[in-house]
Structures are given as C-alpha cells and as structure tokens.
A protein has these predicted regions:
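Long, solvent-exposed, polar/charged low-complexity segments
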Residues: 1-41, 140-210
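Short secondary-structure junction/hinge motifs that connect adjacent elements
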Residues: 32-56
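Compact, glycine/acidic-enriched structural inserts
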Residues: 42, 89-154
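A generic structural signal for short, non-catalytic loop/turn and secondary-structure boundary residues
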Residues: 44-47, 63-65, 80, 89, ...
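Amphipathic, interaction-prone secondary-structure segments
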Residues: 47-84
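Short, charged low-complexity intrinsically disordered segments located at boundaries
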Residues: 58-68, 102, 117, 151-163
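Intrinsically disordered, low-complexity regulatory segments enriched in Ser/Thr/Pro
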Residues: 75-114, 165-169, 173-176, 184
Length: 210
C-alpha cells in the first residue's frame, strides 16, 4: 500500500489487510478497553468511529493511506474534534502519541493558548516526554508535511512559530521488528504510553475550563 496507495491495490490486499492488520488492531483496542478505559472509568467512546479508514475521502480520486490509527474520544465529540491519544500502525513502525489540531476548533484554540500562556508548565511536561523518547512537532496546517522539523532534545523555550500552529503532535515510535518481538506485550507498552502522555492530555483538555 505504501508503494501503490490506490484503491485498486487496496482491493487486491483487502482480505490480507483485514486478517493481519485490521482485526488484530481491533483486538488491541479491546485489550486497551479492558485494561485501561474500564478500570479507570474513563468517559471515552471506544466503539464508534475510533478507527481511521484506509481509503481516503478524496472525492472519488481513489487514494488510500498506508497506515491505520485509532483514538478514543469523549462523548459529544468525534475522533477528529477531540484531543487524540492516538495509536498508529505503519508498515515499518508503531506509534503512540497525542495530537490536537484545528479540527477541534475551540478546544485547539484553548489548548494552544494555555501552552503559550503557561509556557513554564508546558515545557516541564513536554521535556519529560522528550526525555522518555517522544518527539514534538507542529505545523501551520492540520496535516504535517514530510520533513517538517521535530524536536527530540529537551527545550529551553517553546519553539518559534508554535503560536501559528494548526496542529501539534507528540509521538514515540518503535520499529517493526520490536513490534513483532513484543507480540501481545505491545498492549503493556501501550498502557505505559498512556500513563506517560496523560499529564499533557489533561493539560490540554483542561484548557477548555481554565
């Protein structure tokens, strides 16, 4: 799919993708629900609309993505209009992260404003994540262009240009061979990632009521 990101290639590989990617990803979701959402009584939608689609919504052009991602979201919102604790499957890696972007409208505006206004707190939270292997990135639009700068070393100040961002990402990835070696223990790594990302998640979500 990465070499031929088009609907015809998707049709050829649909059964394989379902058996080896989509269905295991759903079981991964189920494990997160049982081991994280339910025990902590988190108010998340975990069934409807939590997964991305392989085929692009590109007005009939027939394009497709070469990765899948999922994120739970709070009732009353949608996956794209909430702060996203995301889980992503790529051909060569798996990623955990946190994203907030302009699709979230007022929530994004409040989260960005709090980050800029309370920069000392934001830096402390971000630097802890960076030291744990996460990278910070942002872009002037909701999708991040390839090659856009990422920050993987502790910051002395918030990066220039952050105030004009339309999307902010904080992500940690592991390579494909490590994903395969982990097997079912990938869920344990996911639970650790949720714990690591939770302070920043609360910092952004609580900006609505700050």
């Amino acid at each position: 799919m990465r070499q031929e990101p088009h609907i015809e290639q998707y049709r050829k590989e649909k059964a394989t993708l379902k058996a080896h990617i989509q269905e295991p990803f759903k079981r991964y979701r189920d494990d997160l629900v049982v081991n994280w959402v339910l025990p902590h009584q988190l108010p998340f939608e975990t069934e409807r609309g939590v997964f991305s689609r392989i085929l692009k919504n590109d007005f009939g052009a027939g394009g497709s993505h070469h990765h899948l991602w999922m994120a739970f979201y709070r009732p009353g919102r949608k996956r794209l209009t909430d702060v996203q604790l995301s889980h992503s499957v790529y051909p060569d890696r798996f990623a955990w992260g946190l994203y907030v972007g302009a699709y979230a409208k007022g929530l994004f505006r409040d989260a960005l404003a709090r980050t800029l206004d309370e920069d000392a707190i934001a830096l402390d939270v971000l630097n802890v994540l960076i030291e744990q292997g996460y990278r910070l990135a942002f872009a002037p639009r909701v999708s991040r262009p390839a090659g856009h700068p990422e920050f993987d070393a502790p910051l002395d100040a918030l990066p220039d240009g952050l105030a004009k961002a339309q999307g902010i990402w904080v992500r940690r990835t592991i390579p494909r061979n490590q994903v395969l070696a982990l097997g079912p223990d990938l869920v344990a790594e996911a639970l650790r990632a949720q714990e690591e990302l939770w302070p920043l998640y609360r910092f952004w979500v609580d900006a609505e009521n700050a």
